[in-house]
Amino acid sequence: MITVSTDKSKLDIPFLQNFLKDVYWTAGRTLEEVQTTVDASFCFGIYLNDQQIGFCRAITDYVVFAYVMDVFIAEKHRGKGYSSILINAMMTEPQLQQVKIWRLATSDAHFLYQKFGFTSLAHPEKMMEKIVSDQYSVVSDQFKKNQK
């Protein structure tokens, strides 16, 4: 049976870190860093028979803005619609219904998010960013090289 929970005490932090340490967008993230991100976010775990198989989180002020991050389903459970179940749970979560602007970044899952109303930025020229540390890009670049 598939369930989605926002109960942080149910999250399997080592499972999260084991996955996140090897993906391009968070390569090298430590257990402590994963715990810090969980503590500072509105989190969703997806479970198959009470075993965690995926995760996503939102950084939010609960009124104006939410940023979706770290969305994943464990590899052996992909292709079964679980990511749609997870994103649907986030989009319909009662505590997040006032949020007016949702954003995320993806290089390969546009099809998933489009089902929930996400589009490309209307005015990307108005967006800015500041990168304080390129730790993840350096680790990510190395990870990509090792995958070839």
Give the location of each predicted region.
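Conserved active-site alpha-helix within GNAT-family acetyltransferase domains
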Residues: 98-102, 107-131
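Short, basic, low-complexity termini and linkers enriched in Ser/Thr/Gly/Pro
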Residues: 132-148
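Conserved acyl-CoA
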Residues: 85-100
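Acidic/histidine-enriched, beta-strand-rich ligand/metal-binding domains
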Residues: 69, 78, 101-103
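A conserved beta-strand-loop-helix scaffold within acyl/acetyltransferase catalytic domains
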Residues: 32-41, 47-49, 54-72
